[in-house]
Amino acid sequence: MPKNRFLSVLLATFLGMLFPGCECGIVPIVRRLIGKGVPPYAGIAFMLTGPIINPVVLFATYVAFGSSMHMVWYRSIVAIIVAIIVGIILSFMFKEHQLRDDHFPEVNNKRPLRKKMWDVCTHAVEEFFSMGKYLVLGALIAAAVQTFVQTSTLLAIGQGPFSSSAVMMGLAYILSLCSEADAFIASSFQSTFSTASLVAFLVYGPMVDIKNMFMMLATFKTKFVIVVIVTVTLVVYASSLLIYAMGW
């Protein structure tokens, strides 16, 4: 990674285009990248765009909105802007690593191939049990909220330009949808909500939802996670209001 913080954030942001992935699995990847020396602010920039601007998600968005590129461009541009802003802010606020556990075993590249393959399998199992419990817990809470909080209640209060974006962001957080599928849900709200609020839904959900919040809390220090969530929330909300004001 470049030593310049701005170039580092910029590079990490666009790396998300090359690695198709879901927000469910992006946190462990970022944890390992930071453990190998990637600056935390660059890791977060990658974490924010990885589940959004990769080809699989963009194609799903294209199909969900009737083979239209408009929402693909809105979603991509806003996600990139949010990731860059958040990454730069974090680079000034946090100088040291923010991992809860920064111990990573040293890798010996001289071992036999069979041993290396065994280590890969062992590592995969360890990561599954390390982060899987938080994924399951987050999914359980999301399911409970979906069961007891009626979606119609949120939709009823989300008709104004300010409240609609907030409601759709809240809905994205609660539903905790996979980024490959959320566009199909968002498209069903086209007749009810503005384009700006739909963009907020499509950008905010993959960045912050119940599942990945628990995984972030298990991986990073609490203060760092709070700053990330608050900053992402404010920037996404402001971006959606700007889209609304410009009449896009």
Residue ranges of predicted features:
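Juxtamembrane loop-helix boundary motifs flanking transmembrane segments in multi-pass membrane proteins
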Residues: P2, F6, G35, F65, ...
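Short amphipathic alpha-helical coupling elements at transmembrane boundaries
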Residues: M1-P2, P28-G35, D119-E126, A156
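Hydrophobic alpha-helical transmembrane segments in multi-pass integral membrane proteins
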Residues: E180, I185, A200, Y237-W248
